[in-house]
Amino acid sequence: PEEVNVFMETGFFGMEGKLNSGDAHLAVDYEQLLKIGLVGYEKRVRQLKAELDLCVPENIDKYVFYKAVLIVIEAVKTYADRFSLLAQEMAENAQSHRKDELLEISNICSKVPYEPASSFKEAIQSVWFIQLILQIESNGHSLSYGRFDQYMYPYLKADLEKGVIMDCLLYTSDAAD
């Protein structure tokens, strides 16, 4: 309406963030995501969907929501798999150490965020994929990493203890798996 345009033009209020951005001011439960992976959420959603009584009208919206969640999980898995494939293709033309790095990247991207993270590198990659996808979906609007230090520390500590990471965050390629 014209009266709304007057307020927007004068700067009294704006709709920019509401017209072109998704939900905001949120932090993903990365601790849970890293522990169970998207596959954990997928199993739970499939169970909830299977338990719905579709003769109850209120459950139709739930069914549609669960179906959408499963589509998103599959899309995220496909997105990560594309990075895995690209790293694999790049490794074909790479030399020695770089080839090893690219093959490791390919392995990590084929695993997370769909499966739970089991190393510091996997945890970082999992968080990055989810954060990136949310940024793309919501136009980069008010997304927080939350307490990155708290949910990443167990993975850092474990890799430090295994010798996979040195104190200066130098990765060793010959550490025990």
What are these regions (language model features)?
Residues 1-135:
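N-terminal accessory/cap region of cofactor-dependent oxidoreductases and related radical enzymes
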Residues 104-107, 149-154, 173:
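Amphipathic alpha-helical scaffolding segments
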Residues 118, 139-147, 161-168:
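Alpha-helix capping and helix-loop boundary segments enriched in small/acidic/polar residues
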